[in-house]
Amino acid sequence: MYRSHNCGELNATHINKEVTLAGWVQKSRDKGFMNWVDLRDRYGITQLMFDESRSDKTVFELAKTLGREFVIQVKGTVIEREAKNKNISTGEIEILVTQMTILNSSLTPPFTIEDETDGGEDIRMKYRYLDIRRNPVKNSLLFRHKVAMEVRKYLSDLDFCEVETPYLIKSTPEGARDFVVPSRMNEGQFYALPQSPQTFKQLLMVGGMDKYFQIVKCFRDEDLRADRQPEFTQIDCEMAFVEQEDILNIFEGLTRHLLKELKGIEVEKFPRMTYNHAMKTYGNDKPDIRFGMEFGELNEYAKHKDFPVFNAAELVVAIAVPGVGEYSRKEIDALIEWVKRPQVGASGMVYVKCNEDGTYKSSVDKFYDQGDLSHWAKTTGAKAGDMIFVLSGPADKTRAQLSALRMELATRLGLRNPAEFAPLWVVDFPLLEFDEESGRYHAMHHPFTSPKPEDMHLLETDPKSVRANAYDMVLNGNEIGGGSIRIHDKNTQALMFKYLGFTEEEAKNQFGFLMDAFQFGAPPHGGLAFGLDRLVAILGGQETIRDFIAFPKNNSGRDVMIDAPSIIDDSQLKELHIQLDLK
């Protein structure tokens, strides 16, 4: 037995008890006649004492050779600690060591294994196994485990069954790029790694497994944006014989359960917002509703004056920012430069200061009088001491720019409190979106999403107006889950493929197995998938998902610890009948 207790459980009730501990040397303090060592494991830190007058001489001298991160086993007696440490659970005691074995030595770590480390992100990624020893990373992984356990418990109590689906599947060109896997046994043919278990969970519904879930790895070979991973984890769920309301209620319940059990927070019924309302009011389909700054459209009061910029714009839209009416011209100019960056893309910005005396001062006073500006303030909800920022241009583009500004200002003003949780449902998404590059419609979610029955007649005449039986759960400005009611009959699915530009042959080749299954009594069904990595990070109060993943990739999709991806041997390529063309 390497240990009788862990390094986080001993206290004053164990005084005079003989114990065995094992762990890593955090640090040591040599006072000549006495030596203290902090021993660390996953559970905490226990102080060891080596006393020249009470410890075996060999053990005492051996303690002087210990370096950081040495792995040791000690035996000794629990004694009361003279200088108590209230910051750790074992701070009332220490161990008078009688025996010690060095289980393994260690090189000096390339960064300090402390809560606040001197290691940059790159070096910590390279030595991730050392980074995991640090409390922030370790605690993040333990928190992820708790979330996963609560999910499994909640869904299992509702008779959901966890079923594993295949990782080696068929490639489908629709959507993001697949990671492909060559098949040695089937020359010239390839598997794909799943972007989601979508079709398999639908087939499970056809198979009668009416409540399915899975915590599953998914893969997308796409250009990585900040804080994205090529492999990610979903809480994937599907149910048969349900309508949209059933799914919203169950998974709202799951989220409320997680908030209560893990954060001690009771949340009221989630508000619901249509996609169109979210886009018009917040400029995106995942609004952060922890704070206000809702959009006010100013076309009625800003156009048809003498200001050519607004007159030429499709949309003039603004937000009122609380408490920044005293911003200096330098601060305002810096914000204008911020929105003009390529990442945002605005051509400029108009501002209006709402003075305490009820008057207004703007950058366009030449064109608009106090009455006009009063209408702007009323439309945006601006009060004395606030400032109104106005953007103009093409409607969709301008809303996106103002949304970026809204989020940036909220961050600067401390309005995005990570300890506050504001969930909502966004519903009634468009079924289709038009892609200018390809010149055809694409499914906004995926090709298996059911249109709202009352909009079916619009598919031929006005496809962009067809709404989907689709829904997203949004938490603090992040989409943490999304799903839909699925198409469950062959004819409707064939019609959907047609509107998405598939030929009959293409549809049959890619999804014939699903179409065939629909001919054998497919039940009405629908589902949802949560992004576990993002959900855990938000519940854990962090901006980045990386610390909640044991071995993440960097922003280039590389694992710098194991140096992957890597070149494979020519013999392997030959065996797979693959010839590289890297010109």
Swiss-Prot record:
Pfam families: GAD, tRNA-synt_2, tRNA_anti-codon
GO biological process terms, semicolon-separated: aspartyl-tRNA aminoacylation
The protein's Enzyme Commission number: 6.1.1.12
Chain sites annotated for binding ATP: R220, D221, E222, Q229, E479, G531, L532, D533, R534
Region (Aspartate): 198-201
Chain residues that bind L-aspartate: E174, R220, H445, R486
Catalysed reaction equations from the record: tRNA(Asp) + L-aspartate + ATP = L-aspartyl-tRNA(Asp) + AMP + diphosphate
Keywords: Aminoacyl-tRNA synthetase, ATP-binding, Cytoplasm, Ligase, Nucleotide-binding, Protein biosynthesis
Gene Ontology terms, MF aspect: aspartate-tRNA ligase activity; ATP binding; nucleic acid binding
EC class (word): ligase
PROSITE patterns found in the cross-reference section: AA_TRNA_LIGASE_II
Localisation per UniProt entry: Cytoplasm
Keyword DNA-binding: no
Any GO CC annotation of this UniProt entry: cytoplasm
Source domain of life: Bacteria
Subunit record text: Homodimer.
Family, as annotated: Belongs to the class-II aminoacyl-tRNA synthetase family. Type 1 subfamily.
NCBIfam families: aspS_bact (TIGR00459), PRK00476.1 (NF001750)
Function: Catalyzes the attachment of L-aspartate to tRNA(Asp) in a two-step reaction: L-aspartate is first activated by ATP to form Asp-AMP and then transferred to the acceptor end of tRNA(Asp).
Name this polypeptide is given: Aspartate--tRNA ligase
Species whose genome carries this gene: Flavobacterium psychrophilum (strain ATCC 49511 / DSM 21280 / CIP 103535 / JIP02/86)
Gene: aspS
